[in-house]
From Swiss-Prot:
Main location: cytoplasm
EC number: 5.1.1.7
Active site residues of this protein: 76 (proton donor), 226 (proton acceptor)
Residues under site feature: Could be important to modulate the pK values of the two catalytic cysteine residues: 168, 217
Record protein name field: Diaminopimelate epimerase
Pfam families listed in its UniProt record: DAP_epimerase
Domain of life of the source: Bacteria
Function description: Catalyzes the stereoinversion of LL-2,6-diaminopimelate (L,L-DAP) to meso-diaminopimelate (meso-DAP), a precursor of L-lysine and an essential component of the bacterial peptidoglycan.
Metabolic or biological pathway: Amino-acid biosynthesis; L-lysine biosynthesis via DAP pathway; DL-2,6-diaminopimelate from LL-2,6-diaminopimelate: step 1/1
Organism listed in the record: Bacillus cereus (strain AH187)
Entry annotated with the keyword Amino-acid biosynthesis: yes
GO MF, one annotated term: diaminopimelate epimerase activity
Residues annotated as binding substrate: 14, 67, 77-78, 166, 199, 217-218, 227-228
Length: 288
């Protein structure tokens, strides 16, 4: 029987099991199965996945994110805010501004601290990737995919593809509560046009500075929030002429609000909370 200490945290209800790999050890070959086991709501702790906070050669810390199906993702906006909170509060970093390595690249985090606790985290998510090759999706490599039609159940849905280090398909609807989240979501996620699968977002524009948001996450299904998805939604809204670049947009997710801005300089900034749920020790056994 093996075990490790963990902290369960969430960003707007998007919860992960966080493991401090400066102190803990999980064999590389076990990571996918451990992520699946610990995320199980009935036989594990229950979460949207597992995130490792690791040493890095190029930043103070490195984030590795695993979905609850065991697949490894390249980035996670809500996860990054929680990693920023954990790293500062556990003295893995000293400054309130620092970098985090991800499989999608290095991002910059800035934390707001009150009485020694991080109350808010802002992440510079970098520039969005808009070509098919960068997303990635099939088709002409250098061509963006903006408001193209997808036929499902005799209804045409127009979506825009954006990568924020992970792929997103953003669909505008009149009412997110009536969107085909659990039906169209998994169909698009696994469609052959996306060789690495895709996250699917449904967006309802409220005004020039607010939107409602619902998400079907690649490898996890319906979740309360998706930080990279919120960033992709704002970028897609601007590309489609629905919102203005440079303004801070409030994205209303099922779990709460994020503030997102696609700056004139090109990067996307995400600001929101990160909270600790509990600490504990998880025991597991890998069958031979």
């Amino acid at each position: 029987m093996s075990q490790f200490s963990f902290t369960k945290m969430h960003g707007l209800g998007n919860s992960y099991i966080y493991v401090n790999m400066f102190e803990e050890q999980i064999p590389e070959e076990d990571l996918a199965l451990v992520a699946e086991k610990v995320s199980n709501i009935n036989t594990g702790i229950g979460a949207d996945g597992m995130i490792l906070i690791c040493p890095s050669d190029v930043a103070p810390v490195k984030m590795r994110m695993f979905n609850n199906d065991g697949s490894e993702g390249k980035s996670c906006g809500n996860g990054l805010r929680c990693v920023a909170k954990y790293a500062y509060e556990h003295k893995l970093v000293e400054d309130t501004v620092f970098t985090i390595e991800t499989l999608a690249g290095i991002v910059t985090a800035e934390v707001t601290v009150e009485e020694g606790k991080v109350t808010l985290a802002k992440i510079d998510m970098g520039a969005p990737r808009l070509t098919r090759a960068e997303i990635p999706m099939l088709g002409e490599g250098e061509t963006p995919f903006i408001r193209e039609n997808f036929l499902y159940n005799n209804h045409r849905y127009a979506f825009t593809a954006v990568s924020m280090g992970n792929p997103h398909a953003v669909i505008f609807v009149d009412d997110v509560e009536q969107a085909p989240l659990t039906t169209l979501g998994p169909v698009l996620e696994t469609h052959e046009m996306f060789p690495e699968r895709v996250n699917v977002e449904f967006i309802e524009i409220l005004n020039e500075e607010e939107m409602n948001f619902r998400v079907w996450e690649r490898g996890s299904g319906v979740t309360q929030a998706c930080g990279t998805g919120a960033c992709a939604a704002v970028v897609a809204s601007i590309l489609n002429g629905k919102m203005e670049r440079g303004k801070e947009i409030t994205v209303h997710l099922a779990g709460g609000d994020l503030m997102i801005a696609w700056t004139e300089e090109g990067n996307v900034l995400m600001k929101g909370p990160a909270e600790v749920i509990c600490h504990g020790v998880y025991e597991y056994k890998i069958e031979a």
